[in-house]
């Protein structure tokens, strides 16, 4: 299960905004760039002011806005005939860069070497997970399998950000360990599911080619 499956309903709410932007000279790449700059700015704020509360409270808002912008740029590209190869890859690269910019500063909040190491590996696995998902393009479909896709990461990092502010237990080693371990395990499950999905798509495409050549 992944929050990604709620995307069609989310897009339905945002479609009027997407249509308005498309008819007023805004391009999908502009929207993608806005989301990227916003994410980097928030990441810098968390890193620069680790003892301040406002960057942590702002993160869920920024992540929600980023998800909205990500949905809007895709709708604009598809529904208003603005799709380009450059735009597709800009979107993929900016998603990875945005995730790392937003989440890497949280290394300072995890207590103890092991939780920090687990969270660091989680960050590395984000890249692997998305790379496997992107590989799916070669076989006809981009893989968005969960349970730790982009939207899921946004949800659970928002929860962690708020827990730092609201829960004293977030400052303990056991909380840091359990949370970082859960993220790490979930992203590996995601990697496995996406890999299996890519293999299934590859075999399906191969079988289709064999049927055509028979």
Language model: regions and residue ranges:
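Hydrophobic alpha-helical transmembrane segments
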Residues: 1-61, 101-214
């Amino acid at each position: 299960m992944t929050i990604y499956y709620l995307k069609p309903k989310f897009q339905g709410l945002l479609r009027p905004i997407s249509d308005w932007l498309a008819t007023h000279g805004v391009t999908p790449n502009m929207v993608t760039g806005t989301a990227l700059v916003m994410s980097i700015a928030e990441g810098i704020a968390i890193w620069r002011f680790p003892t301040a509360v406002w960057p942590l409270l702002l993160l869920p808002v920024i992540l929600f806005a980023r998800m909205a912008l990500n949905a809007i740029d895709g709708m604009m590209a598809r529904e208003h005939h603005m799709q380009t190869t450059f735009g597709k890859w800009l979107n993929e690269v900016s998603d990875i860069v945005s995730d790392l910019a937003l989440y890497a500063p949280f290394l300072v909040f995890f207590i103890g070497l092991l939780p920090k190491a687990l969270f660091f590996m989680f960050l590395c696995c984000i890249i692997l997970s998305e790379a496997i998902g992107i590989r799916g393009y070669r076989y006809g479909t981009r893989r968005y399998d969960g349970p730790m896709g982009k939207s899921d990461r946004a949800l659970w990092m928002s929860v962690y950000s708020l827990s730092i502010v609201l829960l004293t237990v977030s400052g303990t080693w056991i909380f840091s360990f359990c949370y970082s371990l859960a993220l790490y395990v979930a992203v590996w499950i995601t990697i496995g599911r996406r890999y299996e999905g890519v293999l299934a798509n590859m075999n399906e495409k191969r079988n289709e080619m064999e049927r055509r050549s028979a």
